[in-house]
C-alpha cells in the first residue's frame, strides 16, 4: 500500500479548501505523505495571529466581493486569485521536513525551465534584470506528531490588485498582532509565457512522486459532494465564520473622529475577539445625550458594520428629534469600520 496521498481540489472557495486542508492534516496517519493542490478565487488570506483591519482594506474587499480567510498557520497576508497555484505538503514526524517540500517545488520549477532558489525562511525567488523577484511564499504549522508546509506560486496573478487589498485604510489602529512584510514579486508567466495551473500541478506531482519513488492516483475533492473527511461540516462552518476570520484578531484599539455640522465626534473603541470591550465618546455637540447613550450600547457589541449601525438606529426610539444626526452618525461609523 502506498504511503503517498495526492488530493486535487476543483473548488475555488478558500474556506472550503482550508477546511479540507485542516481535516486531512488532523486525520492523516503519521506514516502518510500528502500533497494537496488547490487554488482560490479572489481572497485575502491572513496568518493565524493577524488583524484583518490592520492588514487589509476591508472596505474595498467588501465592495469588490473579495473574501477574507484566516489560515491556521502563521505568517503574513497574501492576495490569492486564479493566477495562483496553492500547494500543501504534509508528513508525520520525525520525517516532516520543510526543506524536502521546498526542494520538490524547486525541482518542479526546474523541470518547467525555471531556475529558482530558496530565500530567507519562506520564499522562492528568481533572478531578473531588475534583481531577485519572489514567485512563491510559504507558511508552516507543526503539532506534536506532524507538520505541514503550504504555499503559493504566482503564475499569472493580477499583481496590480495586491495594493488594492493589502494596503489597509489609514485607520487609527493601535494593534497588536503580526504585521505583514511586503516583497517584490513577479509572475512565472514573465519567464514562461502561457504557463497554466494544470502544468504546474503536473510538474509538482511528478517531482513529489520522483522524490518518494512511488505513484498514486489523484483524489479529486469537490464541493458538489461533501468530502468524506471526519468533522468536515463543522470545520467548514468554523473556517467560513466571521468569528474565525475576523473575531480571532488580536486585541486592538480604534480611534474614529469626524466633524459634523452639529458638532465634532471622537470615538475610542477597545476590541477583543471581535467584540467592543470599551467604548468612549467625546463630543462638543450641544446635545451629547444620544452619544453618551451610544457609548453604553456599544459595550459588548460585535465590531461589525451592520451591528454598529443597528445600535445607532436603535437610539431613534429614545431620541426621535435627533434622527438626522443619528443617521449621519450611523452611516459614518459603519463606513469607518468596514
UniProtKB/Swiss-Prot annotation:
In the transfer reaction, the free carboxyl group of lipoic acid is attached via an amide linkage to the epsilon-amino group of a specific lysine residue of lipoyl domains of lipoate-dependent enzymes. Catalyzes both the ATP-dependent activation of exogenously supplied lipoate to lipoyl-AMP and the transfer of the activated lipoyl onto the lipoyl domains of lipoate-dependent enzymes. InterPro entries: aa-tRNA-synth_II/BPL/LPL, BPL_LPL_catalytic, Lipoate_ligase_A, Lipoate_protein_ligase_C, LipoylTrfase_LipoateP_Ligase. Disulfide bonds: none annotated. Monomer. Pathway: Protein modification; protein lipoylation via exogenous pathway; protein N(6)-(lipoyl)lysine from lipoate: step 1/2; Protein modification; protein lipoylation via exogenous pathway; protein N(6)-(lipoyl)lysine from lipoate: step 2/2. It comes from Escherichia coli O81 (strain ED1a). This is Lipoate-protein ligase A.
Amino acid at each position: 500500500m502506498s504511503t503517498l496521498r495526492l488530493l486535487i481540489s476543483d473548488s475555488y472557495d478558500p474556506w472550503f479548501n482550508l477546511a479540507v486542508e485542516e481535516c486531512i492534516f488532523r486525520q492523516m496517519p503519521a506514516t502518510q505523505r500528502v500533497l494537496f493542490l488547490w487554488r482560490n478565487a479572489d481572497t485575502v488570506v491572513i496568518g493565524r495571529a493577524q488583524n484583518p483591519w490592520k492588514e487589509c482594506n476591508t472596505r474595498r474587499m467588501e465592495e469588490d466581493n473579495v473574501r477574507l480567510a484566516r489560515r491556521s498557520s502563521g505568517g503574513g497576508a497574501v492576495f490569492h486569485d486564479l493566477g495562483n497555484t496553492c500547494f500543501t505538503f504534509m508528513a508525520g514526524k520525525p520525517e516532516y521536513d520543510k526543506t524536502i517540500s521546498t526542494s520538490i517545488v524547486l525541482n518542479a520549477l526546474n523541470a518547467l525551465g525555471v531556475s529558482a532558489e530558496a530565500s530567507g525562511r519562506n520564499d522562492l525567488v528568481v533572478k531578473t534584470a531588475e534583481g531577485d523577484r519572489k514567485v512563491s511564499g510559504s507558511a508552516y504549522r507543526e503539532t506534536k506528531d506532524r507538520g505541514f508546509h503550504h504555499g503559493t506560486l504566482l503564475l499569472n496573478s493580477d499583481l496590480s490588485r495586491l495594493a488594492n487589498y493589502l494596503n489597509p485604510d489609514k485607520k487609527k489602529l493601535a494593534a497588536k498582532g503580526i504585521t505583514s512584510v511586503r516583497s517584490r514579486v513577479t509572475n512565472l508567466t514573465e519567464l514562461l509565457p502561457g504557463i497554466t495551473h494544470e502544468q504546474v500541478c503536473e510538474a509538482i506531482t511528478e517531482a513529489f512522486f520522483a522524490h518518494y519513488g512511488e505513484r498514486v492516483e489523484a483524489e479529486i475533492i469537490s464541493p458538489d459532494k461533501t468530502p468524506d473527511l471526519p468533522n468536515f461540516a463543522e470545520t467548514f462552518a468554523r473556517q467560513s465564520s466571521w468569528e474565525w476570520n475576523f473575531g480571532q484578531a488580536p486585541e486592538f484599539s480604534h480611534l474614529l473622529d469626524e466633524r459634523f455640522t452639529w458638532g465634532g465626534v471622537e470615538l475610542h473603541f477597545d476590541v477583543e475577539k471581535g467584540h467592543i470591550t470599551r467604548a468612549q465618546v467625546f463630543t462638543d455637540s450641544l446635545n451629547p445625550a444620544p452619544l453618551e447613550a451610544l457609548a453604553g450600547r456599544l459595550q459588548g457589541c460585535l465590531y461589525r458594520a451592520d451591528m454598529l449601525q443597528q445600535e445607532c438606529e436603535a437610539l431613534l426610539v429614545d431620541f426621535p428629534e435627533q434622527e438626522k444626526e443619528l443617521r449621519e452618525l450611523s452611516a459614518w461609523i459603519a463606513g469607518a469600520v468596514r
